[in-house]
Amino acid sequence: RMKVRMTYCNMETEELRYFTQEYSVRELEEWFFSLLEEYKKWADFGYEWQQIRTDSIRALVFPYAYREGQKELAGYVYRSIVRGKKLFIEAPTGVGKTLSTVFPAVKAVGEGKAERIFYLTAKTITRTVADNTFQLLRGKGLRMKTVILTAKDKICFLEEADCNPAACPFAKGHYDRINEAMYDLLLHEDHYHRETIEEYARRYQVCPFELSLDMSLFSDGIICDYNYVFDPHVYLKRFFGEGSQTQGAGGPYLFLIDEAHNLVERGREMYSAVLVKEDFLALKRMVKEYDRKLERQLEKCNTALLALKRECEGFRVIPVKEIDDLVNGVERLSETMGSWLEEHDESPVREEILE
């Protein structure tokens, strides 16, 4: 027989807890090989799907007779991908830019020049145009899986999004059912738009937003807002986080950015932040009777802001190194606040704090 130990580590206190069980070699073998079988079905599907996808792409032809300039545009796009270059396109409405960029991008995926396509847009209507373009190509024989990512507050089944399992029946037990929901979707659908995601989420009682994110891992095309790639707070860590495959020229991902000129202003918004001193004071008064540690950390942030306020009479740009006290205080506060909210999901001030 063999002893197996599982170790839990508290990230804040570094306290360790050990759980030890004893099993026979046969029990461990059965567990291990059953686990391998579960992984194998996903690996088999991935391998077989890649063959199906690649064969369909290589057989795909442009769905219409080329309009004036369309063939040249598609050629520029394909050559830019092959050479690992960036391409900026400006053309009148009605030229067929979407099809002329999506088609060569799809062809590049079929030739192994990229792993998947991200179609980024800021508007629902252009998201629909991109989706319709993939559907058009499917009608001509393309086999690619595409997903449209919808904002959590729009796709959530609750009136107000609350991911607490005690409040949301779709969050409770989500991870017990999500694999079955995903596998069913993979076997029977290629087009993961909002209605399909919601249908399967209800059928398997899982979170529709998390289901769409999980399906993105198995999708060849992802249609989404700019922020899923560029926003430092909500970007898709499964693709762009530390340790993931990197983006960029010659990398595994292609980015088709609709109305890219809008990205400048959106980028400013994504990378800008405002902290109001009075908000820290109000929050401090709110939590005073519930948690002294939180109160102290809020007071430290307030003190740091007060010191900066004195230094900034009039207008002055402060180097980042001069706000270390504030940055460190806010980081500690964020960590403590996150833990407190998890542990006090029924606190009378929880909603006010979140606001």
Residue ranges and their predicted role:
Residues Y47-E90:
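Conserved pre-motif I regulatory segment
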Residues R26-A59:
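Charged, low-complexity
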Residues L354-E355:
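Segments forming glycine/polar-rich beta-alpha architectures that bind adenosine-containing cofactors
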Residues R1-L28:
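Nucleic-acid nuclease catalytic cores
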Residues T101, T128, Y204-G221, Y226-S334:
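Signature of the SF2 helicase/ATPase Hel1-core->accessory helical subdomain module
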Residues M2, A114-E115, L142-K145, G250-Y253, ...:
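Short glycine-/polar-rich loops that comprise or flank the Walker A/P-loop
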Residues Q51-D55, L60, K113-I222, N227-F230, ...:
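A substrate-engagement module of RecA-like helicase motors
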Residues V82-P104:
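Walker A/P-loop
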